[in-house]
């Protein structure tokens, strides 16, 4: 998140004006790379075009199994003779010319649901990350000549209609170096995408966000890597391409001023229904500094000595190891001293003799 309270407005000639704009509250939103990646993966799936293989692919031949008893697999085989194809296996996914396993269908569930508030949270997080210079540089953007981030240009930029004039503005504000990087990055794609309309790959350049389109979209649409978007229709696919935070964004003054009305602030309600701008749970993210502060350490009891837990327990037989036996049964020592185990058990019932039994019968 950015901590500067004021942002300067740059003219289309690259001059820093006297006007200062307060930093919108959305730039104080938490930067959540985990949330941005999760939302991006799901949102990016929603623009896929349905595809499937032909229903009869791999089955356009007459083949039957030979059955058992011929010392070959029971896979269906092409009949006939006079050609190499006869006798070859068919239909199975392991066969040459056979169908694929689980043929793809157009009724696959292509669309993935994303919670509305989760999408808005990720968008706000991506906007906040665009003001952090380290994240913008880490993403690969060339912003060494940019005076400050976020970069705000006067509203005259929205009225530019010629591409050469738009490029001149980019050079004046120090953003053209990023366009040159895009031009040099154009390479032939590896793989079959070359045959499917995706012949080249190139990096992403700056994103220009405007409030009103007075010709800026047509002026910039042919500049390599440069994209345009309305401040009211910002999406995560443009703010964080590839789920990587830190897109280089050029704001027009009108778009920058309307961020508080679009996403809300402490004093302004968002135009998005039922939306509240996310905020940090703690203002200082340096938890180590908080824990080691004098105020916290004054009420925290001192840490005890470190105890190392035994990695494993040595198992011994208590019947053979006397020390282990005494640990399990402390009475075993007295039991052995009294020789209780070797003493004979007293007879509970004495068997009468024959004489005693005869006297009982007489009585």
Swiss-Prot record:
GO terms for biological process: translation. Gene3D superfamilies: 3.40.1370.10. It is found in: Cytoplasm. PROSITE patterns: RIBOSOMAL_L1E (PS00939). GO terms for molecular function: RNA binding; structural constituent of ribosome. One of its GO terms (cellular component) is cell surface. SUPFAM superfamilies: Ribosomal protein L4 (SSF52166). The keyword Cytoplasm applies. InterPro entries: Ribos_uL4_C_dom, Ribosomal_uL4, Ribosomal_uL4_dom_sf, Ribosomal_uL4_euk/arc_CS, Ribosomal_uL4_euk/arch. The keyword Kinase does not apply. Keywords: Cytoplasm, Ribonucleoprotein, Ribosomal protein. Component of the ribosome, a large ribonucleoprotein complex responsible for the synthesis of proteins in the cell. The small ribosomal subunit (SSU) binds messenger RNAs (mRNAs) and translates the encoded message by selecting cognate aminoacyl-transfer RNA (tRNA) molecules. The large subunit (LSU) contains the ribosomal catalytic site termed the peptidyl transferase center (PTC), which catalyzes the formation of peptide bonds, thereby polymerizing the amino acids delivered by tRNAs into a polypeptide chain. PANTHER family: 60S RIBOSOMAL PROTEIN L4 (PTHR19431). Belongs to the universal ribosomal protein uL4 family. Component of the large ribosomal subunit. Mature ribosomes consist of a small (40S) and a large (60S) subunit. The 40S subunit contains about 32 different proteins and 1 molecule of RNA (18S). The 60S subunit contains 45 different proteins and 3 molecules of RNA (25S, 5.8S and 5S). This is Large ribosomal subunit protein uL4. It comes from Candida albicans (strain SC5314 / ATCC MYA-2876).
């Amino acid at each position: 998140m950015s901590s500067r309270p004021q942002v300067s407005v740059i003219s289309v000639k690259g001059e820093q004006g006297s006007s200062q704009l307060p930093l919108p509250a959305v730039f104080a939103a938490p930067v959540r790379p985990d949330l941005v990646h999760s939302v991006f993966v799901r949102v990016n799936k929603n623009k896929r075009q349905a595809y499937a293989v032909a229903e009869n692919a791999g089955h356009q031949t007459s083949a039957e199994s030979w059955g058992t008893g011929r010392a070959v697999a029971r896979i269906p085989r092409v009949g006939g003779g006079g050609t190499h194809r006869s006798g070859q296996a068919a239909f199975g996914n392991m066969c040459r010319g056979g169908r694929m396993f689980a043929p793809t269908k157009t009724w696959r569930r292509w669309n993935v649901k994303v919670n509305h508030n989760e999408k808005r949270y990720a968008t706000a997080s991506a906007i906040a990350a665009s003001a952090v210079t380290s994240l913008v540089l880490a993403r690969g953007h060339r912003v060494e000549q940019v005076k400050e981030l976020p970069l705000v240009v006067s509203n005259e930029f929205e009225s530019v209609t010629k591409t050469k004039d738009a490029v001149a503005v980019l050079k004046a504000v120090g953003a053209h170096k990023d366009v040159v990087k895009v031009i040099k990055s154009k390479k032939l794609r590896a793989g079959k995408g070359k045959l499917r309309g995706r012949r080249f790959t190139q990096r992403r350049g700056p994103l220009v966000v405007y409030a009103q389109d007075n010709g800026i979209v047509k002026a910039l649409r042919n500049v390599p890597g440069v994209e345009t978007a309305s401040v009211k229709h910002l999406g995560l696919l443009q703010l964080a391409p590839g789920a990587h935070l830190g897109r280089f964004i050029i704001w027009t003054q009108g778009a920058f001023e309307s961020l508080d009305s679009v996403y809300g602030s402490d004093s302004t309600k968002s135009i998005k229904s039922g939306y509240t701008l996310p905020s940090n749970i703690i203002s200082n993210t340096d938890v180590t500094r908080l824990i080691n502060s004098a105020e916290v350490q004054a009420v925290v009891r001192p840490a005890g000595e470190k105890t190392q837990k035994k990695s494993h327990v040595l198992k011994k037989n208590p019947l053979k190891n006397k020390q282990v036996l005494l640990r399990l049964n402390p009475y075993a020592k007295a039991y052995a001293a009294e020789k209780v185990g070797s003493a004979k058990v007293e007879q509970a019932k004495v068997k009468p003799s024959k004489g005693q039994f005869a006297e009982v019968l007489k009585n």
